[in-house]
């Protein structure tokens, strides 16, 4: 069984930061990520939104032709940029000596983590566990998610088409930025 000083569950911005900091201080570190390095921040959240807004606002980017937006080309560029960012984070972790395991990490005790990956299940021993698994969007009890009509924030960039109309619930920073993103593409967002 492999053994580490620290196991970090989650490879989003918090998990990667914790893993790099621990490795810089001399700890033997393993990071366990259920999906892709970068977590929600890079693949579902603010990064794709900021990249998309940047491309739409930059007239020389070629994504906004007098009000016509090639949404397929735009989403392809966003996806490519996100993959590059994920690879850069993965490279930085490797350079710092952090071991990466892809799978779902389940703490079995304060010193043992079970990793469930697609093809196998294995245990890893550790002295400490850092949980940085982030969050996931919740639906409003009276308005459940219907993937074609009511879309959680995590799924906004999965569909590479632009709807005719958008109604955004939530006015935090992400909701306001998302409203700007759609406003620039369809001319209205509520």
Where are these regions (language model features)?
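N-terminal Rossmann-like FAD-binding beta1-loop-alpha1 element of flavoenzymes
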Residues: 4-31, 167, 175-184
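Conserved acidic residues
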Residues: 12, 104-106, 172
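Conserved mid-sequence domains
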Residues: 151-154, 171, 181
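Residues that cap or flank secondary-structure elements
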Residues: 10, 80-81, 170
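Glycine-rich flavin
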Residues: 20-27, 32-164
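Short secondary-structure boundary/capping elements
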Residues: 148, 173-174
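Conserved small/polar residues in nucleotide/adenosyl-binding loops
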Residues: 189-190
């Amino acid at each position: 069984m492999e053994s580490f000083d620290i196991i970090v569950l989650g490879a989003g911005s918090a998990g990667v930061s914790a893993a790099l900091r621990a490795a810089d201080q001399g700890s033997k570190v393993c990071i366990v990520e259920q999906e892709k390095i970068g977590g929600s921040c890079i693949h579902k959240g603010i990064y794709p939104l900021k990249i998309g807004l940047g491309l739409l606002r930059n007239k020389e980017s070629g994504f906004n032709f007098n009000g016509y937006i090639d949404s397929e080309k735009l989403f392809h560029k966003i996806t490519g940029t996100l993959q590059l960012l994920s690879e850069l984070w993965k490279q930085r972790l490797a350079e710092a000596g952090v071991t990466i395991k892809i799978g779902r990490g389940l703490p079995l005790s304060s010193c043992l983590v079970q990793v469930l990956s697609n093809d196998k299940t294995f245990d890893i021993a550790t002295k400490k566990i850092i949980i940085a698994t982030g969050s996931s969007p919740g639906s409003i009890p009276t308005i459940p998610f219907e993937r074609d009509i009511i879309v959680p924030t995590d799924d906004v960039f999965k569909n590479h088409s632009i709807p005719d109309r958008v109604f955004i619930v939530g006015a935090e920073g992400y909701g306001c930025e998302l409203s700007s993103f759609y406003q620039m593409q369809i001319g209205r967002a509520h």
